[in-house]
Amino acid sequence: MEKKKVWFWGVKDDGEGGGGRGGGRTKDAEDDVADHLSRDGTMSQYSLSKGLLPSLGANNRSSRDVILPRFIVSPFDPRYRAWETFLVFLVLYTAWASPFEFGFLQKPRPPLSILDNIVNGFFAVDIVLTFFVAFLDKVTYLLVDDPKRIAWRYASTWLIFDVVSTFPYEIFGSLLHESIQGYGIFSMLRLWRLRRVSNCFARLEKDRKYSYFWVRCSKLLLVTLFVIHCGACFLYSIAAHYPDPSKTFMALTDENWKESPIAVRYNTAMYWSITTFSTTGYGDIHGVNSREMTFILFYMVFNLGLSAYIIGNMTNLVVHVTGRTRKFRDTIQAASGFGQRNNLPVRLQDQMVAHLCLRYRTDSEGLQQQEIIDSLPKAIRSSISHYLFYEVVDKIYLFHGISNDLLFQLVTEMKAEYFPPKEDVILQNEAPTDFYILVTGAVDIIARVNGVEQVVSEAQRGHVFGEVGVLCYRPQLFTVRTKRLSQLLRLNRTVLLNLVQANVGDGAIIMNNLLQHLKDSEDPVMKGVLADTEHMLAQGKMDLPLSLCFAAARGDDLLLHQLLRRGSSPNEMDKDGRTALHIAASKGSHYCVVLLLEHGADPNIRDSEGNVPLWEAIIGRHREIAKLLAENGAKLSLDSVSYFSGLAVEKNCLDALKDIIKYGGDVTLPDGNGTTALHRAVSEGHLEIVKFLLDQGADLDWPDSYGWTPRGLADHQGNEEIKTLFHNHRPVEKKPKPIPGIPQSPVTGKPLMKYSSEPTMHSGELVLDGGQVVVSQKRKLNNFRNSLFGIISAANSADDGGEVPRSPAVPGGGGSMIYPERVTISSPENGETGGKVVLLPNSMEELLKIGENKMGFVPTKVLTREGAEIDDITLIRDGDFLLLSRDP
């Protein structure tokens, strides 16, 4: 049997279906529903007020996944809902016609009889349709689509009543005797259909598209009119069947009432019925005979209960609207009484009343957004807060430079509050529990001096106050009082610290912003706070997590020493991959550099751009720092020398180029694209640097990867001074000045190999490390090194900024082997002429120690073949012949 989808969200079934109850069709149905919801952007009215909620658990059997058999209709199908709504209007007609026919008609009379049969026809169709409508099991809340169970349920409940109320009286009346007037009684059976109206109002009361107040009022009005209509029809029926028409209530106004038109009689009966129901007018129905008196007795008792029900409902509706006002007035009265009873100052009493009035206003106008936000899921709360307040918080000086992640979290945790004019937000000397951001309005910053309040300044939109007390953990410095209606964002100190604990780098930025703000302030109070705060930082008494980079950026060697003693890693990095040694070297903080080196900081560690601390000191023109770093093993790696040379040229810093040479670098080397420092100097037009580079042996005909030579660039740019300099320059054969530790090999005429990689941090390039040849692996700085996985892997790998094991022979370019330096040592005292070949050690002390072992005496100095004394190991090249001697 073919199946079709059952919809719970008002989606039409455009397909004919097919297949069984397999998961494929179920999945298609789910996908179609999801597409429907995505297109509309919101769920239809059937999703919440009329649909089903799935049961808990991932493996529940939800009715949303049911695929109904063919010809079975879902009770949630919008077409079936429309059919039910249409029948409700027919029921309203039946509610009027049935009592009227019972009281005023003795037999069928057109056009009512025709309309009755038409209406009966629609309800007959509904009886047949009900046999094909699935129903919900009240126990399992699953949709039952078995035709047999549907038929049995309907047949055992409402079928007999629906059939009887739909059966035409013309067929039924022909079976009765003429003396039996059953037309009116039979018409009253149709009132069974009123249950549909009750169900319809129950659905409307839950539908958010309709006002609950007006739905309830409409329902009560219809109930009242129906009761009055039934009362008039029933009482008229009693009068019409009474033997003596003159002894009825109708005869009180017109003795010949039976001769009046039926409309007049109906109007008279309705008048007496409504005056009795509402107990208004000049009197109630006056029962003349015993039948009328008996009916009126029950009618009045019923009216008493119905009136109580209506009055109770209307009272609840009205009280719900006015309850807030009553509660507000009671609260205001209680607050005023409290202030007067305790002799509070008038200013405090006014603040109490103003705050309560503002809270009532925000409640009544729907502005109390915090209560609404707190009732929503976290994701929705975060999105709302981000939309409303992110732009304001992003401009606060305290959060300049922090990550977007922390800023988003801070915005989510902030609470929006309204404050009326002249209300104290913060009191001077109170505990620092919160700080505030001003969204709208204005506040006065007030200081109490010698018992007198003085306005220090005024804060406008986008300002923050209370942050000094919160971040420095000291009593609030000022009283903050609103000038006009203001909206504030409040952030709790505990929440802030918890967020900063997970973002240590951002915490340092926040503290730095605060200290800079205090430093820029001209207020003497702020200057005192700055001094106290710096002292607390040096003593390590701040709750905020501080990093070495923060201390190095401030040049605070006391704080740096305190953090190092607490176990902070001397090589920890900030978000840019810079270590505290990078920062201290760039700022020339001598004591900070000494502390870091003493605690094991790596002098050759690189940041994310490939810069080393030695280069930071060189480019910052801190010669003492550069010398200190060099003495502690800092070097310029071969793969970065060309990059540093290019930076020095761009900054037009000739001294930096000289320092590069001083610390073993070759400023004539090309980068990975074949570009040399001379190329850049010509492009920038730095004549003095061009002269210096030519003196260092730079090749003015060296082409880069695009074929441009320095000479060609000078001709292209038309720089006459440089062109003249090139023309007058006499090319001399320059013996390459190697970086110490790099062996020399004969030039084969093959040009320097060019690489497509970046000019810095090349993989597989050679660096200097105590005169030995090592391999410098390319490092990619990212968040991995700070993660748990990075920490674990760093213990098992030397690639994470640690030393790389040395190898006696390292593969060079083109598959050749590059061997370490070798020298020949000899001693005139032993009479040797040939000498002995040894590996060049890392220091002069080691060389003298080797000589002692080889020569059998204790040498004290190293000489060249010509007799010149050598006092630095870096002056010795591969293949040199050395003489060892001792002082006489």
UniProtKB/Swiss-Prot annotation:
The organism of origin for this protein: Arabidopsis thaliana (Mouse-ear cress)
Binding site for a nucleoside 3',5'-cyclic phosphate: 398-519
Membrane topology, Cytoplasmic segments: 1-84, 135-155, 206-219, 313-888
Transmembrane intervals: 85-105, 114-134, 156-176, 185-205, 220-240, 292-312
Domain notes: The segment S4 is probably the voltage-sensor and is characterized by a series of positively charged amino acids. The pore-forming region H5 is enclosed by the transmembrane segments S5 and S6 in the Shaker-type (1P/6TM) and contains the GYGD signature motif which seems to be involved in potassium selectivity. The KHA domain (rich in hydrophobic and acidic residues) present in the C-terminal part is likely to be important for tetramerization.
Extracellular side: 106-113, 177-184, 241-267, 288-291
The name this protein goes by in its record: Potassium channel AKT6
UniProt feature: intramembrane region: 268-287
Keyword line: ANK repeat, Ion channel, Ion transport, Membrane, Potassium, Potassium channel, Potassium transport, Repeat, Transmembrane, Transmembrane helix, Transport, Voltage-gated channel
GO molecular-function terms, A-Z: voltage-gated potassium channel activity
Subunit architecture: The potassium channel is probably composed of a homo- or heterotetrameric complex of pore-forming subunits.
Tissues expressing this chain: Predominantly expressed in flowers; especially in pollen.
Organism phylogeny: Eukaryota, Viridiplantae, Streptophyta, Embryophyta, Tracheophyta
Subcellular location: Membrane
